[in-house]
């Protein structure tokens, strides 16, 4: 009897499911893989959804419709599909969907990266760009970058040709640079600061069943996810509150980003009100967007160079020729290093630190390739798939070959859609200049100052799980000083 009742309930739920989504299927006619009742296509996503979505796109096309539970999601997987979303219909798809993860960890999406498109987002972006991320501000941080790179090189040199955890060293470097330019001093010494950032970044990539299947939201509580998110949010808020309080108490002899925000709160110099939660949310953006992503890129660059010793030798020859007789590489030296820039582009193509762009959401009805897309539809651009598209990059699209960029004018600043690791359009990452200059000068100094030997399996390119895709295992290497 109980089994019979369960079957009836399941039958009714299935009928309601297909009735509810019949309209969506008629409106959005992009190819779509078969889905299951209630969960949609969620069962087809692996721990690395960028890979799963890429493989599905090979069968269902560059613009395909999936259902994450009850939520229809369009996935763009080629350069032209990305152009349609991020350029042709940029304004329409400039907003963000609501997310339990963002609500919990990012001050209810009050930060710039996850805020809905509108006046608040424009205000937060203008503040961050003007006072932290503009080319002028990035140049003003040159001494900080050089000082921290010098400390990093000294740390490596002290290893005396013993194995070092380069992943850990790079993470410390980027954290310290971000802390100094945004907060005025380091906060990672003698604290669990770095562990907290790692936890935050892992959880930002966590899947919450309740966001897509509302009637199963209780499973997030039973699994302990709700409690873990709450703890991370509280721990980070305590840290940010301490940082803000330190600045209010006048702890520091130079004006930094937090000081600017607090001054604007007092005298309303921005022309709009900015409250304490918004200040903490903007500061949080600096860590979310600038720490893991920056260290991860250098980590993948070194991984690929060690796997391709001919490329490493070629890069070292270029850097050491240009910087002959110098003890280190300056940012001015970088300008003439064409092969270095090609290596950076190739690493960004194969290993975009954030392989799936933060989901976009349409603010109004729109026609996308002759399909009517209703307002509120989510769109995900798979940067990992775009960077490995054979039609664009050729039959060796999955191979690390920096030389391809010496033969191509393509750049990663949002105009060439075959290479958009920082996104494009209105929601493009505003920290691109900050990230690129740090990455180039760090990589150049590493290959200039040391010869490198891997102690790991050189074929190991296993990926971690999370919003930022790092190596699954830390990169251990043996450096040999050249000076």
Swiss-Prot record:
One of its GO terms (cellular component) is membrane. The keyword Cytoplasm does not apply. SUPFAM superfamilies: Cytochrome P450 (SSF48264). Heme binds at residue 429. CDD domains: CYP71-like. Its main location: membrane. It is found in: Membrane. It comes from the Eukaryota. The chain crosses the membrane at residues 1-21. GO terms for molecular function: heme binding; iron ion binding; monooxygenase activity; oxidoreductase activity, acting on paired donors, with incorporation or reduction of molecular oxygen. Keywords: Heme, Iron, Membrane, Metal-binding, Monooxygenase, Oxidoreductase, Transmembrane, Transmembrane helix. It is a single-pass membrane protein. InterPro entries: Cyt_P450, Cyt_P450_CS, Cyt_P450_E_grp-I, Cyt_P450_sf. It is an enzyme of class 1 (oxidoreductase). Its cofactor is heme. Its EC number is 1.14.-.-. This is Cytochrome P450 71A23. It comes from Arabidopsis thaliana (Mouse-ear cress).
């Amino acid at each position: 009897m109980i089994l019979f009742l369960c079957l009836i309930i399941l039958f009714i739920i299935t009928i309601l499911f297909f009735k509810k989504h019949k309209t969506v299927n008629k409106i959005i006619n992009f190819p779509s893989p078969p889905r299951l009742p209630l969960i949609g296509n969620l069962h087809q996503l692996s721990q690395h959804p960028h890979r799963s979505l890429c493989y599905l796109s090979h069968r269902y096309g560059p613009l395909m419709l999936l259902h994450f539970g009850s939520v229809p999601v369009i996935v763009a997987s080629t350069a032209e599909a990305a152009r349609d979303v991020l350029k042709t219909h940029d304004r329409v798809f400039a907003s963000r969907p609501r997310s339990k993860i963002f609500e919990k960890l990012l001050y209810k999406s009050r930060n710039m990266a996850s805020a809905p498109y509108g006046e608040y987002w424009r205000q937060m972006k203008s503040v961050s760009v003007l006072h932290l991320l503009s080319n002028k501000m990035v140049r003003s941080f040159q001494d900080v970058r050089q000082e921290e790179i010098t400390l990093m090189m000294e740390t490596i040199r002290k290893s005396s040709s013993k194995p070092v955890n380069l992943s850990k060293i790079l993470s410390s470097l980027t954290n310290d640079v971000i802390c100094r330019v945004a907060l005025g001093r380091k906060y990672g010494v003698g604290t669990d600061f770095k562990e907290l950032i790692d936890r935050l970044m892992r959880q930002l990539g966590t899947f919450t069943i309740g966001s897509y299947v509302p009637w199963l939201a209780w499973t997030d509580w039973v699994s302990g996810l709700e409690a873990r998110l709450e703890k991370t949010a509280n721990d980070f808020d305590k840290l940010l509150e301490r940082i803000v309080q330190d600045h209010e108490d006048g702890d520091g002899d130079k004006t930094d980003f937090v000081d600017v925000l607090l001054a604007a709160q007092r005298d309303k110099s921005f022309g709009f009100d900015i409250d304490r939660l918004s200040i903490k949310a903007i500061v949080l953006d600096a860590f979310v967007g600038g720490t893991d992503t920056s260290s991860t890129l250098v980590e993948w660059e070194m991984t690929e160079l060690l796997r391709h010793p001919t490329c490493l030798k070629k890069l070292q020859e270029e850097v050491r020729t240009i910087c002959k007789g110098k003890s280190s590489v300056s940012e001015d030296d970088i300008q003439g290093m064409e092969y270095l820039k090609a290596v950076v582009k190739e690493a960004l193509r194969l290993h975009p630190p954030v392989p799936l762009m933060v989901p976009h959401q349409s603010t109004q009805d729109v026609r996308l390739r002759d399909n009517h897309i209703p307002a509120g539809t989510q769109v995900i651009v798979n940067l990992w798939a775009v960077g490995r598209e054979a039609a664009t990059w050729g039959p060796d699209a999955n191979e690390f070959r920096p030389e391809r960029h010496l033969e191509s004018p393509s750049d990663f600043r949002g105009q060439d859609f075959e290479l958009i690791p920082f996104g494009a359009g209105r929601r493009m990452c505003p920290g691109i200049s900050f990230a690129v200059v740090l990455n180039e000068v760090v990589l150049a100094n590493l290959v200039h100052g040391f010869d490198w030997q891997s102690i790991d399996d050189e074929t190991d390119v296993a990926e971690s799980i999370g919003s930022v895709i790092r190596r699954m295992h830390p990169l251990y290497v043996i450096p040999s000083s050249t000076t």
